[in-house]
Structure formats: C-alpha cells, structure tokens
Curated annotation (Swiss-Prot):
One of its GO terms (biological process) is L-histidine biosynthetic process. Keywords: Amino-acid biosynthesis, Histidine biosynthesis, Leader peptide. The gene is hisL. This is his operon leader peptide. This protein is involved in the attenuation mechanism for the control of the expression of the his operon structural genes. InterPro entries: His_leader. Belongs to the HisL family.
Amino acid sequence: MNSVQFKNHHHHHHPD
C-alpha cells in the first residue's frame, strides 16, 4: 500500500 493512499485512507477528525 502506498503511503499516500494510507494517508488518504486514514481517519482524521480535524478540519483541513
């Protein structure tokens, strides 16, 4: 799995 995909798939509960 690509690191970028992982970050994309990661659940972040903070506003961008």
